[in-house]
Structure formats: structure tokens, C-alpha cells
Amino acid sequence: NDVGCPWVSQYDFWRELYYFHKYIGVSNCFALYTATSLASKYAGLEDVTGSIDVGKEADMIVVSENPLDDLKALRHVEKVFTRGKLIDHPKVKINKIVETELDKYL
């Protein structure tokens, strides 16, 4: 994620997955796979992370809708599990100007 770019925020990785699906034509499932299991494989970390398995580190999010149906469901994170801790309804400071402009491409 290019955090230093003014039009890419630290909280909008879901958009990159959505654009990958919309503009390249991959399935929602494949977009999620590339961001998790495949990314860990390319980073040489597939034995440590990238999937939810016994003995692996597993940071994950909970959303109310199914991202396999619509990747925009990832926009509304209800819970985060990270390093064994729960963050319930995480608060994220959102740049409204950036969001409004980027929403034009959804």
C-alpha cells in the first residue's frame, strides 16, 4: 500500500482489492486470496501467516456483510483481532475529501 500517496489512505486497502476486481476482472475470492495467502507466500511467510491455521499468527477483521458477495463490505470493519487482542468497532480518522473523490470510482 502506497501510504505516502495523498490519494491512498492507510485505511483503504479494501479499495485496492475492489479496484482489482472491478477493473481487472478477478473474482472477489481471488482478490482476497492475493491479499492474504498469496501475499504471505511471496513474502516467504506462508508458514507463519496468510491463513487461519493452528500455530499461525492470524490478524483478522470481522465485517457484517460477506466480502465474497461485495468487496465494499470490507469498508465497514466491526471488529479487529490482532496479536490475540480484540478491538471492537475500531475508530479510524477518515479524510472526507479523499473519500468523496475516490467514491466516484466505485
Give short role names for the model-derived ranges:
Residues 1-63:
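His/Asp/Glu-enriched, well-ordered alpha-helical/loop segment
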Residues 35-37, 41, 54-100:
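C-terminal cap of metal-dependent C-N hydrolases
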Residues 100-106:
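A short C-terminal boundary segment appended to hydrolase-like catalytic domains
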